[in-house]
Amino acid sequence: MMHLTRCIALLALSLGATLATAGETATVLITGANRGIGLEYARQFEAKGYTVIGTARNPGEAQELAALGVRIEALDVTDGASVAALAKRLEGVPIDVLINNAGIGDRGDVDVLATDLALFERTLAVNTIGPLRVTQALLPNLRAGSRKHIVNMSSRLGSITLNNGNYPAYRASKSALNQVNRSLSIDLGKEGFVVVVVHPGWVRTEMGGAEAPLQPDESVRGLVALIEKLEAGNNGRFYDYLGAELPW
């Protein structure tokens, strides 16, 4: 029954994306595109005819991404020089959709009192500061784009309302990202930007693990459908991969 409900919701999302939007030539930049959800984003957007720019810390090791024939750029979201260099290489290139996907996980079997503070800092650096750093650097490209969409990959675990313990660093990093997203939506909304945070579901990736119920293609299919129909009324909101709004 749960699977049927997901299928119906995904179909509704897909039908909601207009043919004009789906058929436009647009450029999407995806951070952390060498594996998992990021790679699946690249695969599905490329199949739809988008110009795809995928980033990876080590492009030479991103064989699956390279096989798609998309543009690959080196990027470490925690390194200001790396982000600035990417912005320099992309100078003058309009970007319609930025997907801040690069992220790291956290051990789920520890409580906040036992968490490794060095790991906590690293998780915040990647999952919270990284997306803001990339957004700041690529803002000229996004302003030159026609859609002006920024999608920050959050998680249901970032919801304060839904917190039931464990994953302290990851939860905190995604809650903080939600706040960053809200601030961006306010500051950039007046320019016509739509800035959202999304939860991909529990996905069977290296981070999600083998027990996760969702395959990457199912999760990303829903997310792509959601992204393609974003409009002003969605700005600043928090959605799951089926398009349902989540509590903060």
Where are these regions (language model features)?
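Structural signature of the Rossmann-like NAD(P)-dependent dehydrogenase/reductase core
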Residues: 30-31, 100, 149-155, 194-199
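Conserved glycine-rich cofactor-binding loop
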Residues: 34
